[in-house]
A protein has these predicted regions:
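Short, hydrophobic-biased segments on the C-terminal half of alpha helices
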Residues: 50-51
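N-terminal intrinsically disordered/low-complexity leader segments
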Residues: 1-5
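A short, conserved structural fragment
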Residues: 54-62
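N-terminal helix-turn-helix DNA-binding core of bacterial DNA-binding proteins
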Residues: 6-41
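Basic, amphipathic "hinge/linker" alpha-helix immediately C-terminal to the N-terminal HTH DNA-binding motif
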Residues: 65-84
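Residues that mark the N-terminal boundary/hinge immediately upstream of a DNA-recognition element
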Residues: 29-31, 70, 87
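Anionic-ligand-binding alpha/beta catalytic cores of soluble enzymes and soluble regulatory domains
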Residues: 92-132
Length: 132
């Protein structure tokens, strides 16, 4: 297992994606409570994970204000979001899965999509850059 693989757990990816989404709503750092609400977990659990993300260099902690993704954290978030969107499109368009099911399936599969399969799916979809 590479160092990259040890950092890239589903939890790290989910947190990065959630922080990215909350950051995109405004200029303020993301608070522990906002992140806990977004992920449906307790603020205590969020605090423990934020400490880990900070140690990994994926976030910058601003005391009493919240957190922001670093460039590395943002790269992870954007890659997971791309995986998710490609998978949603592929599941619906190529496999005919109903749209009311594709999001939940993509949530699971986004964490295990290899670079090779990502490229094949993108090619199959015509290298789409539009979110479904």
């Amino acid at each position: 297992m590479s160092a990259k693989d040890m950092i890239r757990t589903p939890a790290v990816e989910d947190y990065s994606k959630a922080i990215f989404s909350l950051e995109s709503r405004g200029d303020e750092p993301v608070s522990t409570n906002a992140l806990a609400e977004r992920l449906g977990i307790t603020p205590g659990s969020v605090s423990a994970m934020l400490k880990r993300l900070d140690e990994l260099g994926l976030i910058t902690h601003l005391p009493y204000r919240g957190v922001r993704l670093t460039d590395d954290g943002r790269r992870i978030a954007l890659e997971v979001i791309r995986h998710h969107r490609l998978l949603e499109s592929y599941l619906a368009e190529a496999l005919g899965m109903p749209w009311d099911r594709v999001h939940d399936e993509a949530e699971v599969l986004e964490h295990v999509l290899s670079d090779d399969l990502e490229e094949l799916i993108a090619a199959k979809l015509g290298h789409t850059t539009v979110a479904p």
